[in-house]
Amino acid sequence: ISLRRRTDIPMIWDELANSDAAVAQLISEDAAEGVGLKISKNGGLTPCRRQRDICISAGYSLSVQDTVGSDIAFAAIAHLGQTIPAHLLRCILDTRDMVSITTADAASAEKGNFDRHSGWITASEAPGLGIEPRMEVLGEPVKTYR
């Protein structure tokens, strides 16, 4: 039985929408109107892209967030948020104010950083996430892959 049919209060799944299976169950049980995608909790950008596509196909509203953030996390949030149709995007969370250190800078002055205008954020057009990590802040890598 659908929880949505028992109340007129809109339901958004947040912490429970943490995998492809959870999102599929949410939709199959008609349990909510939307999902809050948390990139680090959901396994990174690739799983979140799949979950985004599943939710968009079902007409669910989406927010893109993370549990806590940094400049690097926010770059991923902003880029994923831009891939959601405006009529389904509830919000993205600017996680940069959650930490007191700066972990990255804009990759290119010409391509810009994250611009805010009329309640929307536009991600950089520079390659990748459009940022240059501050390695002096991050320190040496724990592991590298080639």
Range-by-range predicted roles:
Residues 1-10, 17-120, 124:
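Shared catalytic-loop signature of beta/alpha-barrel
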Residues 129-146:
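Extended hydrophobic packing segments that form well-structured cores
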